[in-house]
Amino acid sequence: MSDQASKPAPAVKKLFIKTYGCQMNVYDSQRMAEAMGAEGYVLTENQSDADMVLLNTCHIREKAAEKLYSDLGRLKPLKAERPDLKIGVAGCVAQAEGEEIQRRMPIVDLVVGPQAYHRLPAMARAGRGVDTEFPAEDKFEHLPKPAATRRAPAAFLTVQEGCDKFCAFCVVPYTRGAEVSRPVSRILAEARDLVARGVREITLLGQNVNGWHGEGPEGSEWGFGRLIRAIAEIDGLDRIRYTTSHPNDMADDLIAAHRDEPKLMPYLHLPVQSGSDRILKAMNRRHTVDQYLRLIERIREARPDIMLTSDFIVGFPGETDQDHQGTLELVRAVNFGTAFSFKYSPRPGTPAYERPEIEGAVADARLQELQALLTSQQKAAQEGMVGRELGVLFEKPGRNPGQMVGKSDYLHAVFVEAPAAKVGDLVRVRITHSAPNSLAGVLAA
């Protein structure tokens, strides 16, 4: 027997990843897991038996850094018990904080920004390091091809990263860098690979996803709408979604894709942030309320059944009650299916950081008023689905025997009694009941 044959197989190394924040972080965590898989790591859901713990952070929400340091504090006993445990911090807080993370928390071995995670395996082999550079090379070119394993029926696919808009409240241009669009060929290859592994729904991701542009196979310039049409041509793919968008990049070809492409779901998340022209200017949003409302009219004319969702920030520096009333008026005018609303929180390094904040109690009251209006609209939208027949893609079994849970065309969670169904089935469901955050129905005859 040769020495090679007699060597024991290397011990399996276990990787635990905690993902904070947006869908792109979910995608990034998956790609980092695949990169570390090439190093012999397998994912574990048990943090205590991991050989590496990776915290993939988000910097959008309030007190993101404090939440990270709190989680790291809870890892101190585990690191003391197992000094060989590698602890890494990835994502946008890693980009923003850099070496400060290791200074405050020496238990952290690795700090890697979102544009450098293709170098995570080399950093792990080195044992310790910080990499928050914006490399010239495309990180996707250096990541291993995903393993040919069966996938869940819905998947994310990053097509664009970074943002050039520089909204006054936002850290994304500083943590994710300038806008970069992935090449058409790479996107289509990854989409085909996902479909070959059982994916029926793809959500295209980007910080400013509808700003994507690239060169098509014939050498012409493509916009995001043309990319969607090309992805829709993939046999076996049934649904396409995308997030997150900027109103200024809702080009004619993208609106036309909503009109013409049946695989593009009738759902659009289009953040507006405020219903006051004065505040929109202070935020550097580069559009007016009227421009947003006219855009909504064009979108609804192209796709009358579309559900619109949005984001709002209340209590932005300088916001008056009149500005707040303008936001309420915009919400009433559009009638959103759902929306996310937050009280402004300052982000170091952003233009709005040094501006005087309004009184906290005033901002809290405005947020409550806005959320009450948005909740009433969401309730009406949910109730309006009762009696309708919707497409539902089953993603997992429900808690009850014979029950399946899936997503509707409009991204609702839908509960259905379907004992013979399986994950990945795309079925028609007649909606019979609505709840604040879900629907229930029966299989259509």
UniProtKB/Swiss-Prot annotation:
Residues 149-383 form the Radical SAM core domain. It comes from the Bacteria. CDD domains: Radical_SAM. Its main location: cytoplasm. Residues 13-129 form the MTTase N-terminal domain. Binds 2 [4Fe-4S] clusters. One cluster is coordinated with 3 cysteines and an exchangeable S-adenosyl-L-methionine. InterPro entries: Elp3/MiaA/NifB-like_rSAM, Methylthiotransferase, Methylthiotransferase_CS, Methylthiotransferase_N, Methylthiotransferase_N_sf, MiaB_methiolase, rSAM, rSAM_horseshoe. GO terms for molecular function: 4 iron, 4 sulfur cluster binding; metal ion binding; N6-isopentenyladenosine methylthiotransferase activity. It is an enzyme of class 2 (transferase). Residues 383-445 form the TRAM domain. It catalyses: N(6)-dimethylallyladenosine(37) in tRNA + (sulfur carrier)-SH + AH2 + 2 S-adenosyl-L-methionine = 2-methylsulfanyl-N(6)-dimethylallyladenosine(37) in tRNA + (sulfur carrier)-H + 5'-deoxyadenosine + L-methionine + A + S-adenosyl-L-homocysteine + 2 H(+). Pfam families: Radical_SAM, TRAM, UPF0004. Its cofactor is [4Fe-4S] cluster. Monomer. Belongs to the methylthiotransferase family. MiaB subfamily. This is tRNA-2-methylthio-N(6)-dimethylallyladenosine synthase. It comes from Paracoccus denitrificans (strain Pd 1222). The lineage of its organism: Bacteria, Pseudomonadati, Pseudomonadota, Alphaproteobacteria, Rhodobacterales. The gene is miaB.
